[in-house]
């Protein structure tokens, strides 16, 4: 189903590029736009995960510089029956995390320094289990490509303005009015592409994540802390790249509060309630607790991401 959804997104992006090309340069512009869109789609499939990680200046970590965090992800991946993903850390005081990659064999999980500082090891395990669930459900392909394409769509309005805004452009079949329409429609289309990613995937990933880590309450507690942190601590990189907001476990943008048609995430309280109900039902989970997560084990420090040459503040694992 995710492959079909991804194909539909790619087709929509191509059609939108062709439409704007038609507004700017008629049939010739439409053909040029088609070639550009085809190239972007090919590039996005193979490189969109790298682009997202680069946008947040994430640094890959291993068991040498982040042994406790790396061990948590390793044991969770084993519980889920997944290949070991690459593990990244990005420097942000806002607690949050995301997963990316076109398939389980080429996947990565990323957490903020703020996440490791604010959450206990058990809560971090719940968050990482959620992200691994996205990888296992193959949500990451759709999520990553959507982030890249939505960002490109939002640029189409500016493209039309600079290259098609000439009132005397005889190649533009709809004239200046058509360009103005494109400037309005393109950002709206970017939002609709993000809305095309069903919010039910978050509930599914929450449930599967609870099964992977072995305790729904770990993730429930983490969601509450992350939501409170995201509401008060800005993520400047996310504000500059709003098309990636739907990739995070909690929306990183300011002003995201309501569980409605225009939200990229379900309401956090609803997600927590579902996890608490799962725990109260006594439902047997498919895997046991992660062996690496033990309240008596403490990490030495939050790893240095290498940004600015400064060591992030030490967190509760210290």
Curated annotation (Swiss-Prot):
One of its GO terms (biological process) is proteolysis. The keyword Mitochondrion does not apply. Binds 1 zinc ion per subunit. GO terms for molecular function: metalloendopeptidase activity; zinc ion binding. InterPro entries: HtpX_protease, Pept_M48_protease_HtpX, Peptidase_M48. GO terms for cellular component: plasma membrane. It holds the Pfam family Peptidase_M48. It is an enzyme of class 3 (hydrolase). Belongs to the peptidase M48B family. This is Protease HtpX homolog. It comes from Rhizobium etli (strain ATCC 51251 / DSM 11541 / JCM 21823 / NBRC 15573 / CFN 42). The gene is htpX.
């Amino acid at each position: 189903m995710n492959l079909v959804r991804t194909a539909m997104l790619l087709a929509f992006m191509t059609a939108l590029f062709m439409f704007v090309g038609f507004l700017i340069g008629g049939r010739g512009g439409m053909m040029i736009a088609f070639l550009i869109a085809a190239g972007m789609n090919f590039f996005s499939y193979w490189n969109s995960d790298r682009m997202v990680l680069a946008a947040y200046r994430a640094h890959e970590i291993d068991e040498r510089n982040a042994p406790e965090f790396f061990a948590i992800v390793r044991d969770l991946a084993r519980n889920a029956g997944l290949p070991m993903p690459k593990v990244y850390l990005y420097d942000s005081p806002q607690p949050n995390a995301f997963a990316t990659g076109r398939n389980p064999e080429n996947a990565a999980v990323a957490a903020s320094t703020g996440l490791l500082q604010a959450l206990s090891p058990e809560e971090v395990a719940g968050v990482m289990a959620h992200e691994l669930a996205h990888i296992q459900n193959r949500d990451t392909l759709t999520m990553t490509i959507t982030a890249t394409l939505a960002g490109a769509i939002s640029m189409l309005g500016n493209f039309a303005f600079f290259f098609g805004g000439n009132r005397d452009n005889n190649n533009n079949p709809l004239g200046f009015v058509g360009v103005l329409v494109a400037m309005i429609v393109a950002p709206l289309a970017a939002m609709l592409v993000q809305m095309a990613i069903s919010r039910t995937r978050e509930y599914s990933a929450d449930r599967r994540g609870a099964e992977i880590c072995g305790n729904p309450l770990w993730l429930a507690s983490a969601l509450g802390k992350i939501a409170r942190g995201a509401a008060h601590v800005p993520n400047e990189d996310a504000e500059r790249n709003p098309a990636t907001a739907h990739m995070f476990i909690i929306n990183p943008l300011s002003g995201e509060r309501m569980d409605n048609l225009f939200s990229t995430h379900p309401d956090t309280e609803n997600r927590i309630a579902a996890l608490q109900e799962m725990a109260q039902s006594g439902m047997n989970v498919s895997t046991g607790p992660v062996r690496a997560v033990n309240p008596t084990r403490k990490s030495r420090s939050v790893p240095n991401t290498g940004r600015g040459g400064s060591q992030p503040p030490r967190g509760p694992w210290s």
